[in-house]
Structures are given as C-alpha cells and as structure tokens.
Amino acid sequence: MKKRQNKAKNNLLWQYGLGMTILFVVISASFLYLVFLGMKPYQTAKSEGEKLAQQYTGLEQADQVDLYNGLESYYSVLGRNKQQEALAVLIGKDDHKIYVYQLNQGISQEKAEAVSKEKGAGEIDKITFGRYQDKPIWEVKSGTNFYLVDFETGALVNKEGL
C-alpha cells in the first residue's frame, strides 16, 4: 500500500513538473513572438528607407538609418555617395518626398550634442537627423527631452519634453 502511495505521489510530481515546463515554454514563446512583432515595423522602415535613398540619391553606403517622427515622419538615412561625400537623406514617410543634404555644409552630430548639453541636456540617448518647420535639424534625445538643433546655424530651435 505504501508503494502504491509513493508511486501515485511520484506520478503527481512528474505531472506537475511537466505542466510547469509546458507553461513556461508557452509563455516564453509568446513573449518572443510579441517582441518580434514589435520590431517588425521598425526593421521594415529601416530597409525601405535605405532602399529608397540608394535608389533615388546615389547613396552607396548607408551608415545610419532611423525613423524621425516630428511634425511629419521621415526616413532618415546617413551615409556616403560614390564620391565618398557624407550625405543625409530624408524621405517623407507619407509622400516619399526626398531631401538631400551634404553633412559638411552644416554642423556635426557632435556639435549638436554639445549645443544640447549647453542647454541642459544630460546623458545623450540618441541623435537623429530630421526636418522641422522646413529646416534640417538634429534631434537630440536626452532622457524624456528632445532638443532640436538647427543643422545650418547650430542654434537651438526647440526643446520638447514628454
């Protein structure tokens, strides 16, 4: 009788362990699938932006591709053309209007970062090239604040906080 009770107890423990393992696998797979679904639009935007920039502007090498979301949304592509000139290409997400800027004709990312820090930015999270009120800008993200620095003059255009 004791043998039967021990066998039933072991069987119950085995079933419990199997059930917990299956539950863990299902929850982990669901989480990974949701992460994959969340990243898909961003990856699609990056590849589409890079492809359009190479197709219409002669961009040969894309170094940085981002999605800029300001008053309007743009694919922001930084790279080099065949003459190895550094370019910034902005492609309107909705209308696919293309703007091309030579990076040597404005301030650098480092200068935009320095201007933002002068105006109170802490640790810099991300710098994205964009367009605000028909002017090219560097968008510097620091914590919950966004500093918009004019690409041509280096002046702070706007500071936005979340």
Model-derived segments and their meaning:
Residues 15-33:
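Hydrophobic membrane-insertion alpha-helices, especially the h-region
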